[in-house]
């Protein structure tokens, strides 16, 4: 830890400059939360009630193991997260990583996020070493493979490389069972086909978690959380406009769920900043709460609506 702190500080300051050790000098991997704080982060997430229940089940098992030292080395803790983009898969993966580290199941508070292109090479014989290097870099923590189904999709040669990647992963998941957790993530149907075509993977995955799309009310709550987290507020009229935009946008086939909400909040903030700039020409004007109040004029319907590729039929 000492060496990591010094390296972190040396990268920011001149060699002879006298500096004071500050919290930001501590590498992220060492900024460890206690378990109650981690569980609060989990429970504060909007929706995901079934996921929270399943994570709590895992916590109960790991806490029992810590108290009794039962033998769980042969348990399968590799996971599969299925659901549309923006439904919280990566966020929950980060929280699970913190939990596993806090309870001593993994050695490092480290989540390594990759996709198929990080695992598969373009030439014969190079995929296995490339996959091995990625797994090796993730040892001691959690390896999160997003859009994992794309490992085995594509033209014949690509599929061949994908099979090599899967074979390597299977061996390493077994060999390093006590040093690595792998989480495969992706769309529901694509992940089902991916697992069905690889029986070896299915047998090594101990948990499958389904992340459902957020309801309109949950999406609106995520938006409000972003507003309040930034010490801002929003008028009822503006909030109603946001709700209407979310309702229409959510009918698109490739709607981004929570990710879309973060994007529209950013766009609304930009519009709000422009409007404040227009009416606040005097830089010395007295600061008022109105500056942090989002109103209907900040909600630009054309910029915020998401049409997507097509629209879902209501009620089907």
Question: What are these model-predicted stretches?
Answer:
Residues 108-138:
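Short glycine-rich substrate-engagement loop in P-loop NTPases that contacts/grips substrate
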Residues 116-127, 150-163, 208-210:
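Flexible beta-alpha connector loops of hexameric P-loop NTPases
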Residues 1, 49, 250-277:
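The conserved phosphate-sensing helix
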Residues 33, 273-316:
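C-terminal engagement/docking regions of AAA+ P-loop ATPases
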Residues 74-109, 133-136, 205:
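Walker A/P-loop
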Residues 34-79, 98:
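Pre-Walker A (pre-P-loop) alpha-helix and adjacent loop at the N terminus of AAA/AAA+ ATPase modules
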Residues 149-156, 166-212, 229-230:
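Canonical AAA+ ATPase core
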Residues 103-108, 190-196, 202, 211-255, ...:
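Conserved C-terminal "switch" segment of AAA+ ATPases
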């Amino acid at each position: 830890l000492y060496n990591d702190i010094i390296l972190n500080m040396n990268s920011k300051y001149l060699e002879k400059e006298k500096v004071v050790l500050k919290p930001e000098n501590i590498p992220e991997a060492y900024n460890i939360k206690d378990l109650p704080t981690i569980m609060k982060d989990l429970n504060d997430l909007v929706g995901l009630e079934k996921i929270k229940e399943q994570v709590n089940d895992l916590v109960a098992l790991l806490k029992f193991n810590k108290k009794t030292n039962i033998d769980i080395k042969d348990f399968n803790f590799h996971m599969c997260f299925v659901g549309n983009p923006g439904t919280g898969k990566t966020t929950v993966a980060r929280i699970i990583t913190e939990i596993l580290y806090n309870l001593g199941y993994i050695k490092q508070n480290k989540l390594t996020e990759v996709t198929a292109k990080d695992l598969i090479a373009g030439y014969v014989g190079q995929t296995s070493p490339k996959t091995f290097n990625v797994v090796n870099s993730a040892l001691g923590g959690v390896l999160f493979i997003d859009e994992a189904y794309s490992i085995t999709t594509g033209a014949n040669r690509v599929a061949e490389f994908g099979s090599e990647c899967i074979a390597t992963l299977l061996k390493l998941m077994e060999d390093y069972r006590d040093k690595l957790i792998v989480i495969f993530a992706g769309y529901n149907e694509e992940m089902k086909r991916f697992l069905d075509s690889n029986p070896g993977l299915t047998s090594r995955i101990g948990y499958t978690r389904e992340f459902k799309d957020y309801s309109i009310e949950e999406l609106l709550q995520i938006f409000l959380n972003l507003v309040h987290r930034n010490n801002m507020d929003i008028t009822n009229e503006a909030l109603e406009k946001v709700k209407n935009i979310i309702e229409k946008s959510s009918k698109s086939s490739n709607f981004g769920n929570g990710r879309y909400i973060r994007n529209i909040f950013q766009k609304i903030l930009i519009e709000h900043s422009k409007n404040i700039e227009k009416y606040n020409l005097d830089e010395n004007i007295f600061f008022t709460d109105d500056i942090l109040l989002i109103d209907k004029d900040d909600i630009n319907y054309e910029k915020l609506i998401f049409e997507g590729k097509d629209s879902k039929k209501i009620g089907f």
